[in-house]
Regions:
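N-terminal polar alpha-helical/low-complexity "assembly arms" that mediate subunit docking
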Residues: 1-140, 235-303
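Carbohydrate-recognition loop of C-type lectin domains
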Residues: 136-256
Length: 303
């Protein structure tokens, strides 16, 4: 795995600026304040009228409370749009620009191809992490994390990178591709090497080698035993497969470990009693290797 240890943004506490919005509470507060505007001797009558849904004043306060709820939600959304941990889409792109980092293109669109090739852009998670690493790029590519940051910024097809120095004045950068199984083709390696070899990035004394990650293919074959048998069995099986696919298709990493306990955790969705993996061997990838799931084969277990 690479040596850069970013703050786990998902573990940050919920920001206080984001408030929980309750329409009924807003409406009750609106009614209470409206009642207080009448003379004390008339407030009981007004309160009784506001308890009636057909009362025009009630409708007016309901509309007003709804508008306030919408406004508060807009304030919430504007607040999180300015937080690196929570921003998405173009809001995140504008935040990343503060670090001189932009979203990269993984694959250019080609509508004339058969079938048409869609445009693929860097994911929010990848862009967010590169923004966190931006300070590493202030140095030339001598330090390990600086090499990693610049390698990941060289091209949108770079999903992950590691950097090691097996001998003095020698740097080996390993690249994992965002396309296919993660193997980096020679063309991508040439782009990364040219980018890293820029006089403003690579120290003069470094001998640079850029290589592709070694891909470790693995399959998941499992028997899924359910709490109860019934018509929902296929739905539970599909939910387990979807859950495991979420893990298998997460942002690609070099040195990722795929352990039996992790697979069990993702397959144990609601309704699953027991999981039995067939022929499983834990995968512990080195910093030069990347696991890639080629098959998920789930079947209902019978006892």
């Amino acid at each position: 795995m690479n040596s850069f240890t970013a703050i786990d943004l998902s573990q940050l506490p919920a920001p206080q600026v984001v408030e929980q919005i309750d329409y009924e509470q807003i409406l009750a507060e609106r009614k209470a304040y409206a009642i207080s505007l009448w003379p004390a001797e008339e407030q009981a009558e007004i309160a009784g009228r506001l308890d009636m849904e057909s009362e025009p004043l009630t409708k007016l306060l309901e509309e007003n409370a709804y508008r306030e709820m919408v406004w508060r939600q807009r304030v919430n959304e504007a607040s999180v749009a300015n937080m690196l941990a929570l921003a998405k889409g173009t809001d995140l792109e504008n935040l990343a620009a503060n670090y001189n980092v932009k979203r990269l293109t993984i694959q250019k669109a080609n509508p004339s191809a058969v079938p048409p090739i869609p445009k693929l852009m860097e994911s929010d998670d990848s862009l967010r992490e590169r923004a966190q690493m931006a300070w590493e790029g202030l140095s030339t590519a001598g330090p390990r994390n600086s090499y990693i940051f610049h390698a990941r910024s060289a091209d949108g097809q770079v999903a992950d990178a590691t950097a090691e120095s097996p001998f003095p004045a020698e740097a080996v950068v390993t690249v994992q591709s965002a396309l296919g199984d993660g193997y980096a083709p020679p063309a991508l390696l040439a782009i990364v090497k040219a980018y890293l070899s820029d006089d403003d990035r690579r120290p003069v004394g470094d001998r640079l080698t850029v290589q592709s990650a070694e891909i470790i293919n693995y399959q998941v074959k499992a028997k899924i035993f359910l709490l109860t048998a019934g018509p929902e069995s296929e739905l539970i099986l599909k939910a387990a497969e979807t859950s495991l696919l979420k893990f298998a298709h997460q942002r690609r990493r070099l040195g990722l470990e795929v352990s039996e306990s992790v697979v069990h955790a993702y397959l144990h969705v609601e309704g699953v009693r027991k999981v039995v993996l067939e022929g499983w061997v834990d995968i512990v990838a080195t910093k030069y290797q990347a696991p890639y799931c080629t098959l998920i084969d789930l079947a209902l277990g019978v006892e």
